[in-house]
From Swiss-Prot:
SUPFAM superfamilies: Ribosomal protein S6. Transmembrane segments: none annotated. InterPro entries: Ribosomal_bS6, Ribosomal_bS6_CS, Ribosomal_bS6_sf, Ribosomal_S6_plastid/chlpt, Transl_elong_EF1B/ribsomal_bS6. Pfam families: Ribosomal_S6 (PF01250). Binds together with bS18 to 16S ribosomal RNA. Belongs to the bacterial ribosomal protein bS6 family. One of its GO terms (biological process) is translation. PROSITE patterns: RIBOSOMAL_S6. This is Small ribosomal subunit protein bS6. The gene is rpsF. The keyword Glycosyltransferase does not apply. GO terms for cellular component: cytoplasm; ribonucleoprotein complex; ribosome.
Length: 101
């Protein structure tokens, strides 16, 4: 099983209820496609290093998952790419040495 860290930034002008729905939707996508959510963190609203789509802030969410295949991460990336609410995302595979400790 491989461990991944998924980080995504939600646009800052979203309503609180809509933000919660987006977080539940994307975390649910990861969980429903055969991965186990190890940890989910909401970092809140933070300033971006540079503007993205005319936004200088965004809501950061970080999720650590464990999965046997890439189905969950592929589906997450596909849906995040077409979502207007997610302004940036990245999926990183953690080193196996780090996860074994």
């Amino acid at each position: 099983m491989r461990t991944y860290e998924v980080m995504y930034i939600i646009r800052p002008n979203i309503e609180e209820d809509a933000k919660k729905a987006v977080v539940e939707r994307f975390n649910g996508i990861l969980a429903s496609h055969g991965s186990e959510v190890l940890e989910a963190k909401d970092w809140g609203k933070r300033r971006l290093a540079y503007e993205i789509n005319d936004f200088s802030e965004g809501y950061y969410n970080i999720v650590r998952i464990q999965t046997a295949d890439n189905e969950a991460t592929d589906e997450f990336q596909r849906l995040a790419k077409i979502s207007d609410d997610v302004i940036r995302y990245i999926v990183i595979r953690e080193d196996e040495d780090k996860t074994r400790k």
